[in-house]
């Protein structure tokens, strides 16, 4: 399980150094093999271990290519999926097209989200956090049943 938000730098080749606290787990779970793709709803990238991504691919394969909405999701997620291998120095090369899509420059936020990471441009991340907090504080929507059961 991945959790926490960490600022990492992209080098001039588009590689990010995976924080050391995750390296052993990534090597154990997937021998450092990762898959990166776009997020359909946020200006960030999604980074999965290969085994976690293969579960998603199985789900995507069950969608109908004859249904326009399902085909769009397949096209966007699979069409942007890029395999990346963690090197001996613990770095991952993020494809240029993906970096461009998410507006990633030098400072990137690596955000743990259970079975995946999100990769955000640092400034976009902080703005998103502010927007999310503002939305939570001003919402008049009733809580979903699942949120009502969440005790922190």
Swiss-Prot record:
Keywords: Cytoplasm, DNA-binding, Repeat, Repressor, Transcription, Transcription regulation
Major localization listed first in the record, in broad terms: cytoplasm
Domain of life: Bacteria
Any one cellular-component term (Gene Ontology): nucleoid
Coiled coil location: none
Residues annotated as domain SpoVT-AbrB: 5-52, 81-124
Keyword Metal-binding recorded: no
InterPro entries per record: MraZ, MraZ_C, MraZ_dom, MraZ_N, MraZ_sf, SpoVT-AbrB_dom, SpoVT-AbrB_sf
Cell compartment(s), UniProt: Cytoplasm, Nucleoid
Record flagged with keyword Glycoprotein: no
Biological processes per GO annotation: negative regulation of DNA-templated transcription initiation
Annotated GO MF terms: DNA-binding transcription factor activity; transcription cis-regulatory region binding
Function, as annotated: Negatively regulates its own expression and that of the subsequent genes in the proximal part of the division and cell wall (dcw) gene cluster. Acts by binding directly to DNA. May also regulate the expression of genes outside the dcw cluster.
Family: Belongs to the MraZ family.
HAMAP family the record matches: MraZ (MF_01008)
Subunit structure: Forms oligomers.
PANTHER family: TRANSCRIPTIONAL REGULATOR MRAZ
Protein name: Transcriptional regulator MraZ
GN (gene name): mraZ
């Amino acid at each position: 399980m991945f959790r926490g938000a960490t600022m990492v730098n992209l080098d001039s080749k588009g590689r990010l150094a995976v924080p050391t606290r995750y390296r052993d787990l990534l090597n154990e779970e997937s021998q450092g093999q990762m898959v990166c793709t776009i997020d359909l709803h946020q200006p960030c990238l999604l980074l999965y271990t290969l085994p976690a991504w293969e579960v998603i691919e199985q789900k995507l394969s069950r969608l109908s290519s004859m249904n326009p909405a399902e085909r769009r999701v397949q096209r966007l997620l699979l069409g942007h999926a890029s395999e990346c291998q963690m090197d001996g120095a613990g770095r991952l090369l993020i494809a240029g097209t993906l970096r461009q899509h998410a507006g990633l420059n030098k400072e990137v936020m690596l955000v743990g989200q259970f079975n995946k990471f999100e990769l955000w441009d640092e400034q976009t991340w902080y703005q998103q956090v502010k927007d999310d907090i503002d939305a939570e504080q001003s919402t008049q929507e009733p809580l979903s049943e699942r949120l009502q059961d969440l005790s922190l």
